[in-house]
């Protein structure tokens, strides 16, 4: 939520229900069905039903309640969460040798999210619309087209922002969770013995009964906790307390009641296995439930899409992705953004997935492997924070990490079979995103190092210009400078070709800190290098966007007055050429050149008026 507009705890808690729990809240649509009637073929056996219910309940307690809500959410970076935030936090107090390892872990976790997010909207919306099979079996052939239509509308409204309809998310999701609970109670009343499954002995009995097959069945149980990363990622919007209150007071009871209600129904009517969620409702409620389920899955999909936009912005600001056009869709909420490239890329991928897999059961078979992979990496990073930042006892952290990894790695291994039934898709997409991010970061680092090594001393140039000044013209010139003590290429080329300088020259460096936000007091530092040269360093958090007007305002407060329409911005446009490299580095270099050519230009990135920008080309060998 916007930090400038404090709201009451009940209001923020209600808002958290509407956004944070969309994904995990729509899991009852398909989870128990896939556990019993999916690819593992357990059927509606008493031990299987009780065993799966027990596993689902204890995963909700151990993974969601204890691991994420009580442990991982303690690791906040100025109140913000998410895998990249956790990566930055973990790297603060570690040595130079360990930091690159933590960066790779964080990037893999972020890449897994990109891979899984393609499946989430597809499986959620399809599972809701498949309720048509219960209402009118003859409409089955329209499930795929209707799913595509619903998601097409969702992706098309992204550019308009969700501020107006977003106010409806919380009431709709609250109604959804109340409906889950009521339907669950309705089922449990007819067969209350199902509550025995709360006892973990039924989970143990399940493993004893089905042995090896039961281990791989964990791949289906994981569907009950997909979306758990959203709890941590959205912490900055709502805060820890509202998210925790929402879970323990509304979401957890509703989920448990609904899962157990479905189990009770199956024990009484095994034929309901074709869709136990919808068959839990009375006939008169089918159509309203279908509409409500569709709305809930659309809201869940919206939360995932917003999460992708947020993660992408963080990656861009931290230097792991090339600059992209980021549009703010709300004047009130700083977190509401729209990234056209990511939006349409995700839309194409989601539609292709729906058309290719055709049924939510096929998608569920591919769902979960990237989620569990991210859970493993989150455990490693959070325990690193516990040791290095919180200074917990090494033995305690080691035991905690071992316990978490036993659980997470078991679920990740159980999902390994999904690779052959579609799980390769999120892994492939995640791998491609990881390659793109690591390529951009590493090649950009090498490029800046090359510029620094071959650059001339800034101090020497300023001293020379003060002794033998060139022709001066009125006004202020701003030169974007990446390296602090190296002459910007644009400044050199301006002197070489135009042989003039402005009366005042500002060398502007933009820095991204590993904190989500930077206080305005620390925003800008100014250093006078000579009577006509100034160095300005503007610092921003990885969840903020540089604002040139704000920078100029801060400069004015420090005594350096700059007016946008009286300032010329000189920027270098780099033309990259590949030098001699091994074949594998040649491929990486070509990918970097493609990313660079399609990156958002600096004037567009910093919203500088086009008529105030002068771009000077320079050729650099990489």
UniProtKB/Swiss-Prot annotation:
Positions of transmembrane segments:
9-29, 52-72, 99-119, 137-157, 165-185, 213-233, 247-267, 276-296, 337-357, 363-383, 394-414, 419-439
A Pfam match is: K_trans
Q: Keyword check for Transmembrane helix, yes or no.
A: yes
Q: Which domain of life does this protein belong to?
A: Bacteria
Chief location of this protein? Answer: membrane
Q: Where in the cell is it found?
A: Cell inner membrane
Instruction: Give the UniProt family note.
Output: Belongs to the HAK/KUP transporter (TC 2.A.72) family.
Q: Which InterPro entries match?
A: K+_transporter, K_trans_C, K_trans_N, Kup
Per the UniProt record, the source organism is Sodalis glossinidius (strain morsitans)
What's this protein's name? Low affinity potassium transport system protein Kup
């Amino acid at each position: 939520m916007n930090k400038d507009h404090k709201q009451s705890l009940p209001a923020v808690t209600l808002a958290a229900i509407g956004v944070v729990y969309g994904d995990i809240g729509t899991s009852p649509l398909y989870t128990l069905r896939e556990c019993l009637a999916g690819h593992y073929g357990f059927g509606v056996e008493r031990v299987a039903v009780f065993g799966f219910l027990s596993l689902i309940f204890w995963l909700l307690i151990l993974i969601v309640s204890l691991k994420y809500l009580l442990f991982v959410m303690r690791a906040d970076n100025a109140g913000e969460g998410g895998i990249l935030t956790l990566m930055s936090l973990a790297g603060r107090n570690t040595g130079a040798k360990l930091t690159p390892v933590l960066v790779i872990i964080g990037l893999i976790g972020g890449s897994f999210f990109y891979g899984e997010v393609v499946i989430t909207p597809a499986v959620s919306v399809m599972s809701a619309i498949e309720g048509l099979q219960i209402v009118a079996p003859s409409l089955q052939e329209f499930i795929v087209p209707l799913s595509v239509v619903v998601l097409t509308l969702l992706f098309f409204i992204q550019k308009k922002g969700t501020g107006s309809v977003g106010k409806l998310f919380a009431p709709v999701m609250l109604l959804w969770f109340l409906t889950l609970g009521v339907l669950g109670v309705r089922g449990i009343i007819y067969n209350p013995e199902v509550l025995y499954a709360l006892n973990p002995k039924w989970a143990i009995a399940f493993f004893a009964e089905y042995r090896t097959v039961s281990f791989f069945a964990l791949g289906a149980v994981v569907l009950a906790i997909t979306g758990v990363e959203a709890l941590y990622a959205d912490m900055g919007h709502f805060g820890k307390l509202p998210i925790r209150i929402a879970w323990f007071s509304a979401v957890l009871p509703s989920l448990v009641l609904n899962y157990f209600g479905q189990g009770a129904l199956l024990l009484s009517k095994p034929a309901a296995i074709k869709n136990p969620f919808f068959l839990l409702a009375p006939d008169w409620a089918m159509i309203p439930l279908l509409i409500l389920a569709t709305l809930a899955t659309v809201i869940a999909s919206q939360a995932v899409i917003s999460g992708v936009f947020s993660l992408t912005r963080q990656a861009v600001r931290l230097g792991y992705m090339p600059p992209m056009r980021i549009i703010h869709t709300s004047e009130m909420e700083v977190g509401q953004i729209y990234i056209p490239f990511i939006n349409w890329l995700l839309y194409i991928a989601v539609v292709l997935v729906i058309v290719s897999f055709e049924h939510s059961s096929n998608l569920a078979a591919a769902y979960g492997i990237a989620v569990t992979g991210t859970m493993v990496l989150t455990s490693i990073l959070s325990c690193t924070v516990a040791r290095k930042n919180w200074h917990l006892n090494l033995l305690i952290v080691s035991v905690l990490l071992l316990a978490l990894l036993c659980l997470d790695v078991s679920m990740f291994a159980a999902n390994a079979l999904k690779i052959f039934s579609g799980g390769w898709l999120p892994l492939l997409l995640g791998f491609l995103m990881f390659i793109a991010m690591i390529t951009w970061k590493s090649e950009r680092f090498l490029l800046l190092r090359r510029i620094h090594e071959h650059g001339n001393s800034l101090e020497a140039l300023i001293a020379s210009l003060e002794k033998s000044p060139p022709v001066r013209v009125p006004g202020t010139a701003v030169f974007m400078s990446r390296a602090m003590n190296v002459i910007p290429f644009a400044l050199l080329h301006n002197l070489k070709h135009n042989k003039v300088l402005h009366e005042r020259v500002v060398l502007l460096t933009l820095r991204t800190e590993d904190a989500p936000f930077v206080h305005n007091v620390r925003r800008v530092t100014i250093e006078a290098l000579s009577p006509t040269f100034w160095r300005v360093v503007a610092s921003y958090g990885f969840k903020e966007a540089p604002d040139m007007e704000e920078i100029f305002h801060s400069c004015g407060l420090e005594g350096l007055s700059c007016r946008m329409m009286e300032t010329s911005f000189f920027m270098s446009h780099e033309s990259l050429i590949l030098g001699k490299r091994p074949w594998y580095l040649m491929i990486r270099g070509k990918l970097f050149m493609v990313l660079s050519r399609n990156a958002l230009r600096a004037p567009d990135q910093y919203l500088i008026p086009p008529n105030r920008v002068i771009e000077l080309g320079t050729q650099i060998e990489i």
